[in-house]
Amino acid sequence: MSAPDSPALAGMSIGAVLDLLRPDFPDVTISKIRFLEAEGLVTPRRASSGYRRFTAYDCARLRFILTAQRDHYLPLKVIRAQLDAQPDGELPPFGSPYVLPRLVPVAGDSAGGVGSDTASVSLTGIRLSREDLLERSEVADELLTALLKAGVITTGPGGFFDEHAVVILQCARALAEYGVEPRHLRAFRSAADRQSDLIAQIAGPLVKAGKAGARDRADDLAREVAALAITLHTSLIKSAVRDVLHR
């Protein structure tokens, strides 16, 4: 289906686009949209007055980009590849103009590669109480208590948990069926903390530079390095397991 250009959505100002996106993406800003334009991911036309005018297709691309970053933690170069895989000037042939295209494999990627499920991390910023976490994960309170004591799961501001805690709990429960106890999972937490410190060292200087769009560039750099780190970690584990099994 070709990109729609209805009177209601054609030629929107950047402020109108911001209002359209914010219900689903509360953290989006005008500077973020301008940054994505500077990166060539969206190309609004310019009115005779010089102001940006966004079409429905531009808005759909923005929604795709923001969702891919938030829900899959993808760096911009991977998102760009996903968008380039779509027919030029077209939106998905199903649903409304704001239904996003499904992510397609990036050329050269194999299972477990960058941009695949192994490198996907949700960043929706959900805050869960202890009761909410237990309900969502369907895990016994005793396991959560043990994971907290072992430092595998931590709480954020106000004592709330994020959405990653749900996945951690479910994985811990599954591993428990193989005799893996919470204390055994400390090594995973320690490795994750060391890797996040390394990513912060790489991306942090961009934020401190204080240039326009610096925070967005640092955020994308962190996503890219994190995706590579996740893929590397997964491959190292697979390689080590193979070596152990074939000794």
Curated annotation (Swiss-Prot):
Keyword match Zinc-finger: no
InterPro entries (UniProt xref): DNA-bd_dom_put_sf, MerR-type_HTH_dom, MerR_fam
Domain HTH merR-type positions: 11-85
GO CC entries: cytosol
GO MF term set: DNA binding; DNA-binding transcription factor activity
PROSITE patterns in the cross-refs: HTH_MERR_2
GO biological process: regulation of DNA-templated transcription
Pfam family, any one: MerR_1
UniProt induction comment: Autoregulated.
DNA-binding region in chain numbering: 14-38
Alphabetical keyword list: DNA-binding, Transcription, Transcription regulation
SMART domains, A to Z: HTH_MERR
PANTHER family: HTH MERR-TYPE DOMAIN-CONTAINING PROTEIN, REDOX-CYCLING DRUG-SENSING TRANSCRIPTIONAL ACTIVATOR SOXR
Comment block on domains: Contains an N-terminal DNA-binding domain, a linker region and a C-terminal effector binding domain. Dimerization is mediated via the C-terminal domain.
Subunit structure, as described in the record: Homodimer.
Function: Transcriptional regulator that binds to its own promoter and thus may play a role in the regulation of the cotranscribed genes Rv1827 and Rv1828. Can also bind several promoter regions of genes that are essential, including ftsZ. Binds to the imperfect everted repeat sequence CTCAA through its winged-HTH motif.
Extra remark: Was identified as a high-confidence drug target.
Record protein name field: Uncharacterized HTH-type transcriptional regulator Rv1828
Organism this protein belongs to: Mycobacterium tuberculosis (strain ATCC 25618 / H37Rv)
